[in-house]
């Protein structure tokens, strides 16, 4: 028999309204015990909430939702009373006196909604993301995920893969039917379409992950280029020590900031040069480790340094060591000394921003550039939010699609193509929860609020 669970749905502490939520087969029994009568589904009732001996604990609104027409798909009772924590604790204690009712685990209401097919896994995760959203756009994107936008894109991919699997496996299982998919250009065409479609979803998911988790921006460059001054300017405080001595920063410095609500992880690193000092060499090694994991790199150049007036050499030396997939923005700092005008230009495929970290002139240009790099939009449009596990699943699916394409075009191996397509379907289905381990479900829902 399914269990009946209860939890406080509003935050712990004082408030105007406090809500307790009950879900499960005993929800109607709890209603009779607390308000003294059966409740008509989907009608608000203003009633006293009573203790076991009949004394009134509080009075408020009682709502009953009958299975399957509820958030969890089970019978649900909501008691909306006053928001004092003592009153809510007394009412919670009263509900737990009903035999068979227990406290809910974190995220258990959403888990029940998932298990009862009221939500898929990506939609359930979007509930927590909507609650935790730190900007208007993150909230709108989480809502789109909750409404199924991400899931619909994934399901379209799954449908395409299933179609291919059906075609390929039929040809393998029934060779007498003369379905020669190896010589059929349509199958390769469909496979290419799915690969392109998946890449578009991966790109959107990457942007959605940045909205949720923040973009990691690493400030890199030669010593004394003004990296620490730029960190301080973006952070709005003296987070890093700044001196005229080259090599002042020996270790990695991190600051978490928001630009119009968009989360940003700014990382200041040691100046890049051939160092003889052991401590500085360690700092430079750590700097490159951070650079290789960045979502974007700000390459700092000292515009007052004669060498930086020909930045191609500095840039080429740096880019030669940088992974090609990491975007780079070039910052020409110290315009107050060089006399260059603050502004943004496009040069040789790079965005170049001229500013002075010391005087803060041009910093707003950099802030706007970072916002746009993160996908900031002022309107109501926006994509979906994505989590790291979603990106991992999409990456694995993309890998097996590429392998399947090789099996088809180079080796004409039908059985191996079918197996790669099976793996693609499995990884995509992990996102929505069609094929998901119990351990993964436990980890996901345990991070939710109690009462959600």
From Swiss-Prot:
GO BP term, pick one: tRNA wobble uridine modification
Q: Which InterPro entries match?
A: G_TrmE, GTP-bd, GTP-bd_TrmE_N, GTPase_MnmE, MnmE_dom2, MnmE_helical, P-loop_NTPase, Small_GTP-bd
GO MF, one annotated term: metal ion binding
Q: Which keywords fit this entry according to its UniProt record?
A: Cytoplasm, GTP-binding, Hydrolase, Magnesium, Metal-binding, Nucleotide-binding, Potassium, tRNA processing
Q: Which residues form the TrmE-type G domain?
A: 214-375
PROSITE patterns linked to this entry:
G_TRME
Q: What top-tier enzyme class does this entry carry?
A: hydrolase
Task: Give me the comment on cofactor binding.
Answer: Binds 1 potassium ion per subunit.
Look up the record and report any one GO term of the cellular component aspect: cytosol
Tell me the residue numbers annotated for binding GTP.
224-229, 243-249, 268-271
**Swiss-Prot/TrEMBL cofactor(s):** K(+)
Which family is this protein grouped under?
A: Belongs to the TRAFAC class TrmE-Era-EngA-EngB-Septin-like GTPase superfamily. TrmE GTPase family.
This chain belongs to the protein called tRNA modification GTPase MnmE
Q: Which gene encodes it?
A: mnmE
């Amino acid at each position: 028999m399914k269990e009946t669970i209860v939890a406080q749905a509003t935050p712990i502490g004082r408030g105007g309204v406090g809500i307790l939520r009950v879900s499960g087969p005993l929800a109607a029994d709890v209603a009779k015990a607390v308000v003294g009568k059966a409740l008509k589904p989907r009608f608000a009732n203003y009633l006293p909430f009573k203790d076991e001996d009949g004394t009134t604990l509080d009075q408020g609104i009682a709502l009953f939702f009958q299975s399957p027409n509820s958030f969890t798909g089970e019978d649900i009772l909501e008691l909306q009373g006053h928001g004092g924590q003592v009153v809510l604790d007394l009412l919670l204690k009263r509900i737990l006196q009903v035999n068979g009712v227990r406290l809910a685990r974190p995220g258990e209401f959403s888990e029940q909604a998932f298990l009862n097919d009221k939500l898929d896994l990506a939609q359930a995760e979007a509930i927590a993301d909507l609650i935790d959203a730190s900007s208007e756009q993150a909230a709108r994107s989480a809502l789109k995920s909750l409404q199924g936008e991400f899931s619909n894109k994934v399901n379209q991919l799954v449908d395409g893969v299933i179609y291919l699997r059906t075609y390929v496996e039929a040809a393998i299982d029934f060779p007498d039917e003369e379905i020669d998919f190896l010589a059929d250009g349509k199958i390769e065409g469909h496979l290419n379409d799915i690969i392109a479609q998946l890449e578009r979803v991966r790109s959107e998911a990457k942007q959605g992950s940045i909205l949720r988790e923040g973009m990691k921006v690493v400030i890199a460059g030669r010593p004394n280029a003004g990296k620490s001054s730029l960190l301080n300017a973006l952070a709005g405080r003296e987070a890093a020590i700044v001196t005229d001595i080259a090599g002042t920063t020996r270790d990695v410095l991190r600051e978490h900031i928001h630009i119009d609500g968009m989360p940003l992880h700014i990382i200041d690193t040691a100046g890049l040069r051939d160092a003889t000092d052991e401590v500085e060499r360690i700092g430079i090694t750590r700097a490159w480790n951070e650079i290789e994991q960045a979502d974007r790199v700000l390459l700092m150049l000292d515009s007052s340094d004669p060498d930086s007036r020909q930045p191609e050499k500095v840039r080429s030396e740096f880019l030669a060591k940088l992974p090609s997939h990491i975007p780079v923005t070039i910052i020409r700092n110290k315009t107050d000394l060089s006399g260059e005008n603050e502004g943004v230009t496009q040069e040789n495929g790079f965005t170049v921003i001229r500013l002075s970290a010391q005087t803060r002139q041009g910093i707003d240009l950099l802030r706007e550039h970072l916002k746009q790099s993160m996908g900031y939009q002022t309107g109501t449009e926006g994509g979906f939010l994505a989590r790291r596990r979603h990106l991992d699943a999409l990456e694995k699916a993309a890998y097996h699609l590429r392998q399947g394409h090789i099996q088809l075009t180079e080796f004409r191996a039908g059985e191996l193509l079918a197996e790669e397509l099976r793996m693609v379907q499995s990884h995509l289905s992990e996102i929505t929860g069609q094929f998901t381990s119990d351990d993964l479900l436990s980890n996901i829902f345990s991070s939710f609020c109690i009462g959600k």
